[in-house]
């Protein structure tokens, strides 16, 4: 049994990480 809340938190964290990396990449460029 998977916990939907934990899954949602993981997805939100993953998206936040991707957004952060994208911003850093734009700043470097």
UniProtKB/Swiss-Prot annotation:
Protein's name in the database = Protein YnfS
Question: What switches on its expression?
Answer: Expressed in both exponential and stationary phase; expression is considerably higher during stationary phase (at protein level).
Instruction: Give the free-text miscellaneous remark of the entry.
Output: Encoded in the Qin prophage.
Query: Which keywords label this protein?
Result: Cell inner membrane, Cell membrane, Membrane, Transmembrane, Transmembrane helix
Q: Which GO terms describe its cellular component?
A: plasma membrane
Which residue spans traverse the membrane?
10-28
**How does this protein lie in the membrane?**
Single-pass membrane protein
| Localization, UniProt | Cell inner membrane
- List, alphabetically, the Pfam families matched: YnfS (PF23697)
Disulfide partners: none
């Amino acid at each position: 049994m998977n916990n939907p809340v934990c899954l949602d938190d993981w997805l939100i964290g993953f998206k936040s990480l991707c957004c952060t990396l994208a911003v850093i990449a734009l700043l470097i460029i």
